UniProtKB/Swiss-Prot annotation:
The gene is PbP450-1. PROSITE patterns: CYTOCHROME_P450 (PS00086). One of its GO terms (molecular function) is heme binding. Cytochrome P450 monooxygenase; part of the gene cluster that mediates the biosynthesis of aphidicolin, a specific inhibitor of eukaryotic DNA synthesis and DNA polymerase alpha. The geranylgeranyl pyrophosphate synthase GGS is required for supplying a sufficient amount of geranylgeranyl diphosphate (GGDP), the general precursor of diterpenes. The diterpene synthase ACS then catalyzes the conversion of geranylgeranyl diphosphate to aphidicolan-16-beta-ol via the intermediate syn-copalyldiphosphate (syn-CDP). This is Cytochrome P450 monooxygenase 1. Residues 1-21 form the signal peptide. Heme binds at C430. CDD domains: CYP60B-like. The keyword Repressor does not apply. It is an enzyme of class 1 (oxidoreductase). Keywords: Glycoprotein, Heme, Iron, Metal-binding, Monooxygenase, Oxidoreductase, Signal. Its cofactor is heme.
């Protein structure tokens, strides 16, 4: 025992000395030491991981951009950019080459097969080619009756619960019911019953926990602490496994259907694709995750921002009610005429981006030119949506909701609209872009056609109270919906 204590002390001191030496090296001598950033972020990845788990990392990154400029160091081996040109430099293709994804971030579960978001370039190309069938114009036309039926049911449920404007309705909850229902149907024909039963399907209810776990694991993996964090949150991971098991059962039912359907995974079931059941499940999870909660967040954010800005609300209501004489005229095709509503959605993407963080890539060993600067090899790089969308050098009055900036308004002539890319750019941009715009415009057009809306608590700081874990942890948005009398 007398020999053990000195050995323990010496070992502890050696470990502390190593950690301090490593932190000093990271701050002053690392290849990225020339790039500015707060010292604790530059010294250790634990700082970034802490704020990601705390849900305020997007604010910290924005603060550093305000302090240091358009490129900042947010971890020992990671940079954030708010250059407009960095979109193509990071996510585009140059001479047939593109920066690889930072797979420690995207592969949060090593047991999960690669999917459309996490796959390498070659695998992604194959998956996207076969999934493209489900997102084609013909497929969307074939699926339009399904979407219209569910949107009509959403409006019916809102009308029932609104009680002629006398009862408070949480539109965030109902938008989530609808978007999960729609993406479940479109992806693999699942009938989740959220709207029909007026309550969460147990599997959908588990998605909130799933998104939180994915956010935690992405943060941990990005700084090499995946196994430790996985052990610490093991009780939270158990519901995720149940979520995946139930999803696998639903996918199994769909793969047993021999009749061809126009849903998204039909292209993955072709004999020449040869995907395992696990790979199909992984892709279904990715598609549902990308097309459900983020779409509901966009809808809720747009409605909240409009109700907080009466002039803009009046314009979008006038556009909807002057364009359509009957509800049957409001279709996926006809809503494309709603230019002001499209501007509102684009402004919401900027003002309240559903995904706040960066989608990280990694530079090759020889380095890469990004934003006109040489970035050393093996550096994680990304554009953080919250930072670039609120950069006063790119947007006039960035914390003000003004859809007019997307309609050539002279007062916003200095805005750099090319800085907004909510669906990313390049060969790996979001495959569901057109569906997202069509679905959200359809729901909002029906909503403003049927109802006059009023916030239940006009003083609620709905936007300011939220944390972000890959997507926003959005609270209830309660309002009164009074049916329009015609």
């Amino acid at each position: 025992m007398s020999h053990f204590l000195p050995t323990l002390i010496l070992t502890s001191l050696t470990l502390v000395a190593y950690v301090l030496a490593r932190m000093i090296y990271n701050v002053f001598y690392h290849p990225l030491s020339a790039f500015p950033g707060d010292a604790f972020f530059c010294a250790t990845g634990l700082t970034k991981a802490y704020h990601m788990i705390a849900g305020d990392l997007q604010l910290k990154v924005k603060d550093m951009h305000d302090k240091y400029g358009s490129v900042v160091r947010i971890a020992p081996t990671e940079l954030s950019f708010s250059y407009c040109s960095a979109w193509k430099d990071i996510y585009g293709s140059r001479g047939g080459r593109e920066l690889s994804k930072f797979y420690d971030f995207y592969r949060v579960d090593e047991a999960m097969p690669q999917h459309i978001i996490s796959a390498g370039k070659a695998k992604h190309s194959i998956l996207r080619r076969y999934l493209a069938h489900g997102f084609s114009e013909n497929a969307m036309k074939a699926q339009e009756p399904v979407i219209l039926d569910l949107v009509n049911l959403l409006m019916q449920r809102l009308r029932e619960h609104a009680e002629e404007g006398a009862r408070v309705v949480d539109v965030n909850k109902w938008f989530n019911f609808a978007t999960f229902e729609i993406i479940g149907k479109l992806t693999f024909g699942a009938d989740l019953g959220n709207l029909r039963n007026r309550d969460w399907h147990p599997w959908v209810k588990g998605s909130a926990n799933n998104n939180m776990v994915v956010g935690f694991m992405a943060a941990a993996n990005s700084v090499g602490l995946g196994p430790i964090i996985k052990w610490c949150i093991s009780n939270e991971i158990l519901p995720r496994q149940k979520y995946l098991d139930e999803l696998a059962e639903m996918v199994q039912k769909r793969t047993g259907v021999t009749v061809e359907r126009p849903d998204f995974i039909q292209g993955l079931l072709r004999d020449d694709v040869q995907l395992s059941n696990g790979e199909i499940v992984a892709n279904v999870e990715a598609l549902i995750g990308a097309g459900s909660e983020s779409t509901a967040t966009l809808l809720t954010g747009t409605v909240c921002a409009l109700l907080q800005n009466p002039d803009q609300l009046a314009k979008v209501i006038d556009e909807v009610r002057s364009t359509f004489r009957t509800e049957d005229e409001i279709t996926l095709h006809s809503v494309q005429r709603l230019d002001y509503m499209l501007a509102c959605l684009n402004e919401t993407f900027r003002y309240y981006p559903p995904v706040t963080n960066g989608m990280p890539r990694v530079t090759p060993k020889e380095g890469a030119i990004i934003g006109g600067r040489l970035v050393p090899g093996n550096t994680v790089v990304a554009i953080w949506q919250w930072a670039i969308c609120h950069d006063p050098a790119l947007w006039k009055d960035p914390y003000t909701f003004r859809p007019e900036r997307f309609l050539e308004a002279p007062e916003f002539s200095t805005d750099v609209r090319e800085a907004l890319n909510p669906f990313s750019v390049g060969t790996r941009n979001c495959i569901g872009r057109n569906l997202s715009y069509a679905e959200t415009r359809l729901i909002l057009a029906r909503l403003f056609y049927y109802f006059d809306l009023e916030l239940a608590d006009p003083d609620q700081d709905w936007f300011g109270a939220q944390k972000a874990y890959l997507v926003w942890d959005a609270p209830a948005l309660n309002m009164y919906l009074k049916p329009v009398v015609r």
